[in-house]
Regions:
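Binuclear metal-dependent hydrolase catalytic cores centered on His/Asp/Glu-rich metal-binding motifs
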Residues: 97-137, 150-166, 218
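Conserved beta-sheet core of the metallophosphoesterase superfamily
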Residues: 153-226
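Acidic/histidine-rich helix-loop elements
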Residues: 4-26, 81-89, 111-119, 209-218
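A short C-terminal boundary segment appended to hydrolase-like catalytic domains
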Residues: 226-246
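Active-site-proximal beta-strand elements of phosphoester/diester hydrolases
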Residues: 2-13, 99-109, 137-141, 196-203, ...
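Active-site environment of divalent metal-dependent phosphoester hydrolases
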Residues: 12-15, 51-56, 79-84, 110-113, ...
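N-terminal active-site segment of His-dependent metallophosphoesterases
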Residues: 1-60, 130-131, 147
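Active-site neighborhood of phospho(di)ester-bond hydrolases with catalytic His/Asp-centered motifs
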Residues: 5-7, 42-48, 72-78, 106, ...
Length: 246
């Protein structure tokens, strides 16, 4: 089973609109073209689909993702409008990935850059894990770990301790995927005597400078995506970068 993660395309209604380092629509086009060549079995897009929160930006994203040769799923980030997303493509909270499954969490706090699950969503997560012991990936927008950039760590998942506590009773959780940070991250979290892999993904748009105290764009880094191979032995992963001719 080959899963690809795309994150943070930050599209505008105007496909020619520029970001700090390029044209987000063209960047996402290039990323999707590269992902098609990966022949994935599924794709997950971990939030911040839109920069301007326009209906047109979600329609443009959905048209691009519909060119993928496989099912695709998305979840909201802090910049997103759930209703506009759902109007273009269903929002789901769980999908089967062969012998694995993936849970998609909504960490959005309306009007705020940070994320939070809260008691209700954490209880729902525990209930989903109680009902199914298949190897499980969890995808969410906000990092549930510190990524090492002070300004980004201040706007991550606020209730990350409660999140990891909720996972502690469920050894079927093998890995967690996040967006938001616009940079590669790979680490582990000790969770009830085992280690859970945690992965961040390069954005499909601008990249952020790793380990920065304050907001800074990494103008030298290209957009990218993450590939995960899921099998009976576990999950292996790699990151690919995409050169965009603009």
């Amino acid at each position: 089973m080959r899963l690809v993660q795309i994150t943070d395309p930050h599209l505008h209604a105007d496909p020619a609109a520029r970001s700090r380092t390029g044209i987000p629509f063209a960047q996402l086009q290039a990323v999707v073209a590269a992902v098609i060549d990966e022949r994935p079995d599924a794709v997950v897009v971990t939030g911040d689909i839109s920069q301007d929160e326009s209906a047109a930006s979600y329609a443009a994203a959905a048209r691009l993702f519909d060119t993928l040769p496989c099912p695709w799923h998305w979840l909201p980030g802090n910049h997103d409008q759930r209703e506009l997303m759902a109007a273009e493509h269903e929002l789901v909270d769980a999908v089967a990935l062969g012998d694995w499954r993936m849970l998609l969490l909504d960490t959005q706090v309306p009007g705020a850059p940070h994320g939070e699950l809260g008691e209700h969503k954490l209880a729902a997560l525990a209930a989903q894990l109680e009902d199914d012991d298949r190897p499980t990936l969890i995808a969410l927008h906000h990092p549930p770990v510190a990524v090492g950039a002070d300004w980004m760590d201040a706007i991550g998942l606020k209730d990350s301790a409660a999140f990891w506590q909720a996972l502690s009773a469920y050894p079927q959780v093998k890995a967690v995927l996040f967006g938001h940070a616009h940079q590669v991250f790979s680490g582990t979290v000790a969770c009830a005597g085992r280690e859970v892999d945690v992965y961040g993904c390069p954005a499909a748009a601008d990249q952020f400078l790793p380990d920065a105290e304050h907001f800074a764009v990494d103008a030298e880094a290209s957009p990218g995506y993450r590939v995960l191979t899921l099998d009976a032995q576990g999950a292996s992963t790699r990151v690919e970068r995409v050169k965009v001719a603009i």
